[in-house]
């Protein structure tokens, strides 16, 4: 089974149609991951991602990392039910009214408490070692930033092994 198969079952699905045992499990994991002193802040930006953000947060909650993290979502002027879902899940979020990914990422970074920040998009599902891989890259001497291209659903442009560091 590919790592994204489970997450794909919730992708593009209205939150109201997701099984309560699953949403409760993700809510619980979000609570468990909240740390007052995180090493890593995972900052997700969202604009009208009501049917996709659950898959993203589910994949982040199940990432294999053995250090404290915090998850921050920036709701960037959404007009759908994105904010309602964030409230239901109990994830830390902030509203950014200035439209655009730059404003949203900056808002998240302004609230981040971690030594390292991993910026993600909320319409994407992330592989099990994504946070650890990015953090290891950032911890290398002399490294100031890391970038990854991940094709979570292989297509003709990107293979399923499309994780690259530049």
Per-region residue spans from a language model:
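Short alpha-helix within the catalytic core of nucleotide-sugar-dependent glycosyltransferases
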Residues: 57-58, 83, 114, 128-139
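Short aromatic/hydrophobic "clamp" motif used to bind/position activated sugar donors
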Residues: 117
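A conserved acidic beta->alpha catalytic loop
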Residues: 59, 75-83, 124
């Amino acid at each position: 089974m590919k790592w994204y198969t489970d997450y794909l079952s919730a992708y593009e699905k209205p939150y109201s149609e997701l099984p309560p045992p699953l949403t409760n499990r993700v809510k619980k994991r979000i609570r468990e991951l909240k740390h007052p002193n995180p090493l890593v802040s995972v900052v997700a930006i969202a604009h009208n991602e009501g049917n996709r953000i659950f898959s993203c947060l589910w994949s982040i909650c199940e990432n294999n990392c053995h250090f404290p993290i915090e998850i921050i979502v920036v709701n960037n002027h959404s007009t759908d039910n994105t904010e309602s879902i964030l409230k239901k899940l109990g994830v830390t979020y902030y509203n950014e009214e200035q439209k655009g990914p730059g404003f949203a990422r900056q808002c998240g970074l302004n609230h981040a408490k971690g030594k390292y920040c991993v910026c993600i998009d909320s319409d994407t599902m992330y592989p099990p070692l994504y946070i650890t891989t990015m953090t290891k890259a950032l911890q290398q001497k002399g490294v100031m930033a890391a970038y990854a291209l991940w094709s979570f659903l292989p297509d003709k442009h990107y293979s399923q092994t499309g994780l690259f560091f530049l």
